[in-house]
Amino acid sequence: MNLKEVFDFYKGKNVLVTGHTGFKGTWLSRILVNAGANVTGYSLNPPTDPALFDMAGLDGKMNSVIGDIRDLVHLKQVFEETKPEIVLHLAAQPIVRDSYKDPVYTYETNVMGTVNLLECVRLAQQQGNAPRSVLNVTTDKVYHNNEWAWGYRENEPLDGFDPYSNSKSCSELATHSYINSFFADKAVAISTARAGNVIGGGDFANDRIIPDCVRAMAAGRKIGVRNPYSTRPYQHVLEPLAAYLLIAQRQYEDNRYAGYYNVGPDECGCVTTGTLVDLFCQAWGDGAAWENRAEA
């Protein structure tokens, strides 16, 4: 990706980022601010303590709106006030295990939150203020799991198993419905992006492999790994963000780029979780070790 080209494109544009206080959302907001975009964020308060958002130097450099993606009235107000040209939808309940604890909240946030956002786009179109480019960020877990050895193409059936994955499958289907029902002329270019497991600086969330490794080392205990033999498409956080920015840019410039995108490493770049933790232990040194805590 040509970073200068991306920065030149986003400079001065009105961009709405939902979920801007989260891990990906903070990094994305920081990049857009650096590019000179007029950034509005809409999100709950930072989900962790400490929080990357509080460390990122964004105070006073963007319009940070604290709100719930389930609140259609508030979200609609933000659309009307900011008139975004580009919308990057990252707001979500992103943790698989939390989706088992509270599936209703997960579906409300990940499905109805997406519907609310798309409804705001539809209403903005009626008023002549529609954004030109909208990207719904989902996950590579939206696909029906066929237990095969190769990757999934964008046209594979969507049928996530657990509440988180399934809610993201539903988010995709809601997006498809809105595209076909209200934006078939592609006056608003809408895409979805399906990225896998992300690592990188500033991630303090629970049930994330690298933060869990660091917490274990800080506590002087072995790292517990639940699925050490599962292969995952781990990627650095800046890699999918670069893809999101490029997709949003390209479809803004040419609506033929609107579609559904897998975002991840080549097959040779995918490793098992155990291999990743081995690499972490080698880098950490000082007797770092892990143990298999596979869940029944």
Across the structure, where does each feature detected by a protein language model lie?
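N-terminal Rossmann-like NAD(P)+-binding domain of SDR-like oxidoreductases, especially those catalyzing
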Residues: M1-A195, Q282
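C-terminal substrate-binding subdomain of Rossmann-fold SDR/epimerase-dehydratase oxidoreductases
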Residues: N34-A37, G67, N197, M217-A296
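Residue-level signal for the nucleotide or nucleotide-sugar donor/cofactor binding architecture
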Residues: R70, K101, T109-M112, D162, ...
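C-terminal structured domain segments across diverse proteins
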Residues: E156, A174, I190, A195, ...
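Flexible loop/cap residues within protein kinase catalytic domains
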Residues: G200
